Amino acid sequence: MESIYKYGWIIPLLPLVSSITIGLGLFFFPKATKSLRRTYAIISTLLLSIAMFISFDLLWQQIAGSPTYRYLWSWIPDQDVTLEVGYPIDPLTSIMLVLVTTIGVTVMIHSDSYMSHDQGYVRFFAYLSLSTASMLGLVISPNLIQIYIFRELVGMCSYLLIGFWFTRPSAANACQKAFITNRVGDFGLLLGTSGFYWITGSFKFEDLFERFNESLANHEVSLFLATPCALLFPLGPVAKSAQFPLHVWLPDAMEGPTPISAPIHAATMVAAGIFLVARMFPLFQTLPLVMSSISWVGGVTASLGATVALAQKDLKRVLAYSTMSQLGYMMLALGIGSYRAASFHLITHAYPKALSSPGSGSVIHSMEPIVGYCPDKSQNIALMGGLRKYVPITGTTFLLGTLSLCGIPPLACFWSKDEIIADSWLYFPILGWIARFTAGLTGFYTFRMYSLTLEGDFRANPSKNLISSYVSPWENSRFGTSSQKQTDSALPLAQNRIESFDPSENIQEFSDKNVKNSVSTQSSREEYSPHPKESDNTMLFPLLILTIPTLLVGFIGVPSYQEEMGPDLLSHWLDPSLSLSNQINYENWLLEFIANATVSVGTASLGIFTASILYGPIPFFPRDLRQKTDLQLEGILGHFSSLLYNWSYSRGYIDGYYNIVFIKGTRILAKIISFFDQWIIDGIVNGVGISGSFGGEGSRYGEGGRISYYLFGFISGTIILLLVVINYKHDFFP
């Protein structure tokens, strides 16, 4: 057992070696490296696969009951401060290692085909390997210093991947936005880390928890000091995991290549924040104010992400806000003290989201030959529809991931989301209502996304004639009428005219320096198909593999069927102290489970049913009734639906508010400071200098060496002095 643990450091080293090798090759031998691009991709995937098998072995050892293993060595030995580096292997670490490596391998396989046309193919694999290595290093960190270093590397890799197509202004702006937003969180994390070290004198997690709790118990440290440190520390996870109010970077992060959406959403960047809060959970649970703050941040984020996702037209942005909402669930669970439910949802959410993200990439890949390579068209769900008949494998796997995100049994997310909703209801009913409301919204926006993307009729009509396709919540696109009002003032995507276009004119629309133009426009016209085509096997294989954990991973949290039932595998595995102290009766557990599941599944089903009525391919009402209903809704709910749509589509106006307060406010403040510095500070300094200069010039002219000038000055001064004495003689000589 211990022999395999000794090689745990190899897991992050393997992708790091791959990234360094590719980077050095691109720097010193660019032509040779690019000519061997497939070889480098295979090597990167193979090395990460080896790391994945080692991770599975470590996971199996933990399941078998092996104790926590720690390997540490001194990095900076000193009498006052001893900083150690190394790696621990415990249940949470082994879970995250498997998550990161399995999703990383599937993403690399998917990227081999998706990025094959891109000139930055080799560079992409270098960035992806470095990002995976950074996340693996973060996962196995035994102290706050090491975790902070790898956290910064994760942020740097996210900056590189989001801005991969840096020639596009939107991508360049998005990576800067992500980088700056996360720096705000990192500043709070750094202050919190420094405060905890000042209180406890250690960066190691075990020593930190023990000394902090002892200090509180012995009243050696005041809550007025400990609480601010503990409140500053979660700012890092809040920014990294896209929690309100530092969530604004995540939707813009979709400007990067689609394959990176899976590691960003499921296993790399955003999971780092949740992982860090889970690591620090033994410390936070002793501070009620901090736990309450974390729970409310999670609840607000979950509902906000689900609400904003209602009206988004970009397929990848819908998934981004879905990730934000699900991460809010995890943060909510940690805040209410449900460590097991949060860890469970971290596992169960990773695989369905990793399935949906490459699935969206497969959908976009099938749309690009039809509408062109511009993201505004290839990712616009208003131009899709009916794709399931053309891409059946992608459609089936995408539906599976969608149902899991909705929380439909027996898929993965059902088990964990149901537990979070039940625990939040017991902790505080308002949080329980927020969790239930968010579950209904999740069912609505995910099935809205699925219906507009894969059901109905294909709306990107390839005819050269301008044909409008009407997308209404009450009127299917096949039955659009000219009498219907075409505005954006109804429910999400309720009324949008989509003009068709000649795809042959758009086939090279997004052919900047990053995209190979190896196929001429003429050949593109000859090979053009009016309908989307299924992706190749290289892109489909990861989707099929990810369906397995999406179906089965949720059962690790289900108690075994026994007459007297003990703790489930996950509880016993994460921490025996979290297991049920007493045996519970299976019938009682089953009745409670059915009662809770009925509410959560019913709420999600209501959202799914509503989305199916509004956006589904099957008309639920006669055509005349739907037209009359539209007219009635315009008068009754038109204003409200317009406000809701505009608020949701505009991301809650949060970006605009930040732009006014922070960006424009900072610029105005900079101008005021510049004016003050230029005219006040510099004015005083320059005024003193100019006064001295003029004084010197005057003295120089007064001392010219001519006696007549001296005599004139002496007589003038004497006369002035006499006049002063005569005028004020009474004052001087009383």
Swiss-Prot record:
Biased composition (Basic and acidic residues): 524-534
Residue segments, region Disordered: 512-534
Keywords (A to Z) from UniProt: Chloroplast, Membrane, NAD, NADP, Plastid, Plastoquinone, Quinone, Thylakoid, Translocase, Transmembrane, Transmembrane helix, Transport
Transmembrane annotation, as ranges: 9-29, 40-60, 89-109, 121-140, 144-166, 185-205, 219-239, 258-278, 289-311, 318-338, 395-415, 425-445, 539-559, 601-621, 707-727
Bilayer topology annotation: Multi-pass membrane protein
A cellular component term, taken from the record's GO annotations: chloroplast thylakoid membrane
Annotated GO biological process: ATP synthesis coupled electron transport; electron transport coupled proton transport
Principal localisation: plastid
Reactions accelerated catalytically: a plastoquinone + NADH + (n+1) H(+)(in) = a plastoquinol + NAD(+) + n H(+)(out); a plastoquinone + NADPH + (n+1) H(+)(in) = a plastoquinol + NADP(+) + n H(+)(out)
Description of how the protein assembles with itself and partners: NDH is composed of at least 16 different subunits, 5 of which are encoded in the nucleus.
Function: NDH shuttles electrons from NAD(P)H:plastoquinone, via FMN and iron-sulfur (Fe-S) centers, to quinones in the photosynthetic chain and possibly in a chloroplast respiratory chain. The immediate electron acceptor for the enzyme in this species is believed to be plastoquinone. Couples the redox reaction to proton translocation, and thus conserves the redox energy in a proton gradient.
Similarity annotation: Belongs to the complex I subunit 5 family.
NCBIfam families, sorted: NDH_I_L, PRK06590.1
Name of the molecule in the record: NAD(P)H-quinone oxidoreductase subunit 5, chloroplastic
Organism of origin: Huperzia lucidula
